[in-house]
């Protein structure tokens, strides 16, 4: 076995490595020239990384502005001259102005399920008035929630003035309880919200003349009769009253979300007619 070992001055070539040492050295030299300056992928120590970053930063400062812009464009992962995509913080449109309409009034109806003697109710109940020559219903008010009820002899009742859906239902139940205490077999049937009214302020004046000319199919504006522009939105089916001052009233909704959707639709239009 000792006779098979090579002499100390002889190097055994590795498998697959050519014996031509000059060509091997030239290939290694080309590979070293093609390797990047940043040794981050090779697991180098942190001081070498910092030194490489500092030297590259100094090289960038020494470049001319035109060469530096070209260099930065070539380093972008999207290619030179390609802008970076918009981040989630970049506003895409004016669809989110940060203005939320406030509910001002909710109108609901309920069926008490019995015939009512309106004179008896008006005489015995508090905060109730009845004038059949003017209006064929008892007008009753309570303080909490601050609402007004119209009570008809057929047993139908309309509740107005609530600021939320919960307050409207609570007020209607209180009115039904008052009628029960007066000796009527009143029930609480078919409660339904019929109309919701909201309002908001866009905080800028609006050119109503230009708006009615552009959107004449959906709007009408007669300042001699009414100072606001009436805009009838198709979807959602909402009527908007738009004033020069920037105040907007939204009515005709059955649910709260319709108010919000209608304002999101109209705000970009109003933005286009800002004075």
From Swiss-Prot:
Its main location: nucleus. Keywords: DNA-binding, Nucleus, Repeat, Transcription. One of its GO terms (molecular function) is DNA binding. One of its GO terms (cellular component) is nucleus. The keyword Acyltransferase does not apply. CDD domains: TBP_eukaryotes. It comes from the Eukaryota. GO terms for biological process: DNA-templated transcription initiation. Sequence repeats lie at residues 103-179, 193-270. It is found in: Nucleus. InterPro entries: TBP, TBP_CS, TBP_dom_sf, TBP_eukaryotic. The keyword Transcription applies. Residues 23-45, 73-92 are annotated as: Disordered. General transcription factor that functions at the core of the DNA-binding multiprotein factor TFIID. Binding of TFIID to the TATA box is the initial transcriptional step of the pre-initiation complex (PIC), playing a role in the activation of eukaryotic genes transcribed by RNA polymerase II. Belongs to the TFIID complex together with the TBP-associated factors (TAFs). Binds DNA as monomer. Belongs to the TBP family. This is TATA-box-binding protein.
């Amino acid at each position: 076995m000792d006779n098979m070992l090579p002499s100390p001055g002889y190097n055994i070539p590795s498998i697959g490595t050519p014996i031509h040492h000059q060509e091997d050295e030239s290939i290694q030299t080309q590979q070293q020239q093609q390797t990047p300056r940043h040794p981050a992928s090779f697991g180098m120590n942190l001081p070498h990384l910092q030194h490489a970053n500092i030297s590259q930063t100094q090289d960038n400062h020494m470049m001319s502005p035109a060469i530096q812009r070209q260099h930065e464009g070539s380093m972008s992962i999207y290619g030179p001259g390609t802008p970076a995509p918009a981040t989630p913080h970049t506003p895409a449109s004016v669809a989110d102005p940060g203005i939320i309409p406030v509910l001002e009034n909710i109108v609901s109806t309920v069926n008490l399920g019995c015939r009512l003697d309106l004179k008896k109710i008006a005489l015995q109940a508090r905060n109730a008035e009845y004038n059949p020559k003017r209006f064929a219903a008892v007008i009753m008010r309570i303080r909490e929630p601050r609402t007004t009820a119209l009570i008809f002899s057929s047993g139908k009742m309309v509740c107005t003035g609530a600021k939320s859906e919960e307050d409207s239902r609570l007020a209607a139940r209180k009115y039904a309880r008052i009628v029960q205490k007066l000796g009527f077999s009143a029930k609480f049937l078919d409660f339904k919200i019929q109309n919701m009214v909201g309002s908001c302020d866009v905080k800028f004046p609006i050119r109503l003349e230009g708006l009615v000319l552009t959107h004449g199919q959906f709007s009408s504006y007669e300042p001699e009769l009414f100072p606001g522009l009436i805009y009838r939105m198709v979807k959602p089916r909402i009527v908007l009253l738009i004033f020069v001052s920037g105040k907007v009233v939204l009515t005709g909704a059955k649910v709260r979300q319709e108010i919000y959707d209608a304002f999101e639709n109209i705000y970009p239009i109003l933005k286009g007619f800002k004075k």
